[in-house]
């Protein structure tokens, strides 16, 4: 999908102020919020309603997740994030899912990312549970079986892989282990690699940096009329490659040259990172924007993530 098409979707994203949340110091933006509402009743009628809506179907920009942030009675952090891989809004149901998504979305290996992927038909997961002697999750009132989901199904050039994101402490709970065992059996039958990802495998510093970079999606629309994003970006990149000036100084010079509002110079840097026009920045460490760069063309030391998929 072209960048211009992706940027058009940006207005659909609800931006909020960053807040501190637990020990991770970050509530990821782009729609992140703490949800607390009543869950819709789950029964046969609700199931067929979601099926008729096309939930869990489609690929790329046409995919519809089985669960959206509007469906859950969650008290955790949920997010809506515009993805660069698919050009659509992704529904992420925890801060760990959001962090992991940023890492997946930045990977050159990812061709498609489908979150909240339903394990259908539901009769199959019920049969798996019965075979394993495990209780299948059901609504406590209607007793209708819940449709189980896998957090992410990622398409690569080698095929699909499935990933479930869980806190390591959750893995000690019997009911969590049972649900994961059903998942494992479901994907094993399809000969698709399935793995569990915990907070121990997620590079949170890289996710934070990527979240910061992603704020520049609508950069072309931020510029004054008559000023082209490509022209400003080329000017910034020229200074970046030919001088050892700190990023902040290049940003200020860019603002002076084009008469931009304060802050847009730094947004130009973010935009260049988003477009992967600055290849040598290590996103696994805090970005140094104020020091003199020792090597021309180096931003410090973006390596784009090639793990987990």
Question: Where does each model-flagged region fall?
Answer:
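Electrostatic, structured charged patches in enzyme active sites and in nucleic-acid/phosphate-binding
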Residues: 2-309
């Amino acid at each position: 999908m072209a960048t211009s098409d992706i940027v058009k979707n940006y207005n659909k994203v609800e931006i909020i102020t960053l807040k501190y949340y637990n020990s991770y110091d970050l509530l990821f933006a782009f729609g992140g919020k703490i949800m607390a509402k009543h869950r819709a009743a789950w029964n046969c009628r609700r199931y067929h309603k979601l099926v008729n809506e096309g939930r869990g179907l489609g690929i790329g920009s046409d995919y519809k997740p089985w669960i959206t942030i509007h469906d859950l009675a969650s008290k955790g952090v949920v997010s809506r994030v515009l993805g660069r891989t698919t050009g659509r809004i992704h529904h992420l149901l925890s801060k760990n899912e959001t962090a992991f998504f940023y890492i997946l979305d930045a990977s050159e290996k990812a061709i498609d990312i489908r979150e909240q992927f339903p394990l259908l038909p539901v009769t199959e997961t019920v049969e798996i549970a019965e075979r394993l002697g495990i209780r299948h999750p059901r609504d406590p009132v209607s007793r209708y079986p819940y449709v189980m989901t896998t957090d992410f199904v990622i398409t690569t050039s080698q095929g699909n892989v499935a990933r479930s994101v869980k806190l390591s402490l959750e893995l000690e709970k019997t009911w969590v282990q049972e649900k994961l065992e059903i998942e494992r059996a479901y994907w094993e039958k399809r000969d698709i690699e399935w793995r569990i990802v915990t907070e121990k495998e997620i590079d949170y510093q890289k996710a934070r940096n990527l979240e910061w970079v992603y704020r520049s999606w609508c950069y072309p629309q931020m510029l004054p009329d008559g000023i082209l994003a490509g022209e400003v970006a080329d000017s910034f990149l020229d200074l970046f490659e030919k001088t050892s000036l700190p990023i902040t100084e290049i940003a200020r010079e860019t603002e002076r040259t084009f008469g931009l509002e304060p802050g847009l110079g730094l947004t130009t840097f973010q935009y260049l990172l988003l477009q992967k026009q600055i290849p040598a920045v290590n996103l696994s460490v805090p970005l140094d924007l104020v020091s003199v760069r020792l090597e021309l063309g180096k931003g410090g030391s973006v390596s784009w993530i090639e793990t987990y998929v």
